[in-house]
Regions:
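Short amphipathic alpha-helical face segments that pack within enzyme cores
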Residues: 2-3, 81
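Short helix-loop-beta junction
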Residues: 3-15
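Glycine-rich beta-alpha loop elements in corrinoid/cobalamin-binding modules
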Residues: 19-209
């Protein structure tokens, strides 16, 4: 968050950081007023479910990524909760971009240990317009540059390191590999394993698709 924020500041943008806001209502998300360009959301340095629960699914008493190791300052599935509260606060026309470790690892259909099921991409449940995965410095600055030019997120389809939902996969700006559907990987463990293998094989930033 700090690195990306400083990068945006270096480009001349004003950045407000709302750390661990009260997620019980949308009011806290309006603390700095309405953003001019958009809202960037991250869940922290660790997946919120890993931070909150042990491998035995017991609630942790401490959160090492919160002030004073105090637990309970972030919600479960923080990216989804924060994105939905931001949408509630600012409306359907506000660009909402999610990123960070939690979003990056959940951008595809994925097995969720705590629910013991395969969940769909976090883009669906968060309602975000776009997901930035990996380190994100270049992508976030490029997104901000285009938003400043009034280019809608729906037209940003050629920024490396981003993911989005579309009903027109044939219009992808890059060579693509089609993975099995969520329904298929939920019902077939072999297809799930093959999809995961393909995802990892295509991570290479030079030759990956």
């Amino acid at each position: 968050t700090a690195v990306i924020g400083r990068g945006l500041e270096a480009d001349g943008y004003r950045v407000s950081v709302l750390a661990q806001p009260d997620w019980h209502s949308a009011e806290a998300f309006s603390a700095f007023g309405r953003p001019r360009l958009g809202v960037l959301i991250g869940a922290g340095n660790l997946d919120s479910m890993v931070a909150h629960y042990t491998a035995a699914k017991k609630r942790r008493s401490e959160d090492f990524y919160s002030p004073g190791k105090r637990a309970g300052l972030r919600p479960d599935r923080a990216t989804i909760v924060y994105a939905n509260r931001a949408r509630e606060a600012f409306g359907a026309d506000m660009p909402i971009i999610i990123g960070g470790l939690e979003a990056s690892l959940r951008r595809f259909a994925h097995y969720d240990y705590w629910e013991d099921k395969v969940r769909r991409s976090i883009l669906f449940d968060s309602g975000a317009d776009m997901l930035v995965y990996g380190m994100g410095e270049y992508a976030e600055r490029e997104i901000a540059r285009r938003l400043k030019k009034k280019i809608p997120v729906s037209e940003m389809r050629d920024i490396a390191g981003t993911a989005y939902l579309t009903a027109e996969p044939d219009k992808c700006a890059f060579p693509a590999v089609e993975l099995p559907s969520v329904a298929q990987v939920r019902d077939n463990k072999r297809l799930y394993a093959e999809a995961t293998r393909t995802e990892y094989a295509e991570h290479d930033p030079i030759r990956g698709r």
